[in-house]
A protein has these predicted regions:
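Structured interaction and signal-relay segments at domain junctions
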Residues: 59-124
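Extended hydrophobic
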Residues: 119-168
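Short amphipathic alpha-helical segments, especially helix-boundary/capping motifs
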Residues: 25-30, 112, 116, 139-141
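Short, positively charged
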Residues: 42-46, 111-120, 172-175
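Short, solvent-exposed cationic patches
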Residues: 98-101, 160-175
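Secondary-structure boundary elements
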Residues: 58-59, 141-142, 169-175
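Intrinsically disordered, low-complexity terminal regulatory regions
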Residues: 2-83
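Phosphate-binding glycine-rich loops and adjacent basic patches that engage nucleotide phosphates
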Residues: 7-18, 100, 120-131
Length: 175
């Protein structure tokens, strides 16, 4: 089931915690167009990661959080209830962002829209790549995708939405 954004909420890129509402490809692509940084520093990684930790703790979400830029891990946190398996999922989802330059959830949704799955049609090892929600590209204006912010521990759409919510807040503060 897909839905269209309510015109009265046109600035909200994704509804928060409505698992029955699956975003359309257009909505997911809009998120990527709008959630762009002017620059992305080590301090930005720390601040964004800390914001994600704060949001996850408010919800008692058992997640691991990771921020990578140009192959370097700039931030990592594992909250209570997360496991080493979440770190493996983070790596697999991040590799999808690095390879496709799009959010892991969007990549999976594009395959589903074609009537197939990422696992069936990508020809990539599912032990190495996972087109499941939770990894979002760090895109710098005039540069392109330079990294990824990733969450693992919730159902994939909730992982995706948590990252988008944090990016909306972070970038809404003029960064």
């Amino acid at each position: 089931v897909t839905h269209k954004s309510n015109p009265s909420h046109s600035q909200e890129l994704t509804p928060k915690f409505h698992p029955e509402l699956t975003p359309s490809l257009e909505e997911l692509e809009k998120q990527e167009r709008l959630l762009v940084f002017r620059q992305f520093t080590h301090d930005d990684a720390w601040a964004l990661g800390s914001l994600l930790v704060e949001l996850a703790r408010e919800r008692q979400a058992p997640v691991a959080i990771d921020i990578h830029r140009a192959g370097q891990q700039l931030f990592h946190a594992a909250l209570p209830g997360s496991t080493p398996d979440n770190d493996a999922w983070i790596a697999r989802k991040r590799r999808v962002v690095e390879r496709y330059g799009s959010a892991s959830y969007l990549v999976g949704a594009r395959f589903r829209a074609k009537g197939t799955t990422f696992e069936e049609s990508s020809r990539l090892d599912p032990d190495t790549y996972a087109a499941h929600g939770g990894s979002f590209p760090i895109t710098v204006e005039g540069v392109g995708v330079i990294g990824a912010v990733t969450v693992s521990g919730l159902p994939q759409l909730q992982d995706h939405r948590l990252v988008v919510e944090a990016l909306e807040q972070f970038l809404g503060n003029g960064r």
